[in-house]
Amino acid sequence: MARLQEFYKEKVVGDLTAKFAYKSVMEVPRILKITLNMGLSEAVADKKIIEHAVGDLTKIAGQKPVVTKARKAIAGFKIREGYPIGCMVTLRGAHMYEFLDRFITVALPRVRDFRGVSGKAFDGRGNYNIGVKEQIIFPEIEYDKIDALRGMNISITTTAKTDDEAKALLAAFKFPFRN
């Protein structure tokens, strides 16, 4: 079992139950999934970019991402329907907790001028989104072997009903909030 998963069951559930006065253990919010999404607008010109991005995301997440395709044609962006324009991977269970552990303890401190993540990036339904500008903050990516710096969106989906509950859940996992 992953370190954060054990920590959740042993400590976080009890703390959140006391803080929010839940009647049942099943009411305590938990993380459902973590989605990593990489949008690649420059992939229209060169198909190799998708392959490199898939390789990077595979190393970061530990499982193979799905290539996302354009749903409809947009002439202004020179995109036709069905063109590969990004890749995404959804993590659940043990993989999700392992990734979250690496993200909080190793990757986030490697961000340049890091002062904490914003506490206002919740969507109103208890889910949290964070943008990463460079994939090299992850230790699995070797700086010498990348072709370009790419960012990604990391979306953490929880069962929390409010943003306050979700923030308390992530703060219990030692998420470095700025405010």
UniProtKB/Swiss-Prot annotation:
| GO MF term list | rRNA binding; structural constituent of ribosome; tRNA binding
Alphabetic keyword roster? Ribonucleoprotein, Ribosomal protein, RNA-binding, rRNA-binding, tRNA-binding
GO biological process terms on file: translation
Q: Tell me which Pfam families the record gives.
A: Ribosomal_L5 (PF00281), Ribosomal_L5_C (PF00673)
Q: Does the keyword Aminoacyl-tRNA synthetase apply?
A: no
Q: Tell me a GO cellular component.
A: ribosome
Q: Which domain of life is it from?
A: Bacteria
Alphabetical list of PROSITE patterns matching this protein: RIBOSOMAL_L5
Gene3D superfamilies in alphabetical order: 3.30.1440.10
Q: Does the keyword field hold Cell membrane?
A: no
Q: Return the NCBIfam families for the record.
A: PRK00010.1
Q: What does this protein do?
A: This is one of the proteins that bind and probably mediate the attachment of the 5S RNA into the large ribosomal subunit, where it forms part of the central protuberance. In the 70S ribosome it contacts protein S13 of the 30S subunit (bridge B1b), connecting the 2 subunits; this bridge is implicated in subunit movement. Contacts the P site tRNA; the 5S rRNA and some of its associated proteins might help stabilize positioning of ribosome-bound tRNAs.
**Subunit-level organization:** Part of the 50S ribosomal subunit; part of the 5S rRNA/L5/L18/L25 subcomplex. Contacts the 5S rRNA and the P site tRNA. Forms a bridge to the 30S subunit in the 70S ribosome.
**UniProt cross-references to HAMAP family, sorted A to Z:** Ribosomal_uL5_B
User: Family assignment?
Assistant: Belongs to the universal ribosomal protein uL5 family.
Q: What PANTHER family has UniProt attached to this entry?
A: 60S RIBOSOMAL PROTEIN L11-RELATED
Protein name in UniProt? Large ribosomal subunit protein uL5
- Give the organism the record lists: Janthinobacterium sp. (strain Marseille)
